[in-house]
């Protein structure tokens, strides 16, 4: 089984059919629509119509194999939809097992963002496991921070996660 990459996608269009096409591309039934790539789980967690802008939108979360680039973008189906409908579309992904995040963005069908960043994520409960703790401290990104076995708890957020590097989910496409 491949490492799973968690992805969050936001798409906006004046055409409802464009939003439906993107949602269909992330379904598991290839007989009913095209499949965007190696997707193990996906769901639309918000969708609607913005009366102020006259645009339809959808937010989709999914687990994909390895990375968005290898599981979806290399297949080319999503790009064809982006170009066909001149979509505004943005994707963030996290793959903490391999230590990276991705950020892709298109406006009017043109790609304007294509970024990858080192990323580490661990929960305080997992730091009690010596193997997981050692793996975390041996990640390249972790070595760039003043985090040690004595102070790691101070790096945790209110939910107990330590996140180093990566991107903030700062949606540009609204």
Predicted regions and their residues:
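Short, extreme N-terminal segment that most often corresponds to the first beta-strand
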Residues: 1-27, 173-174
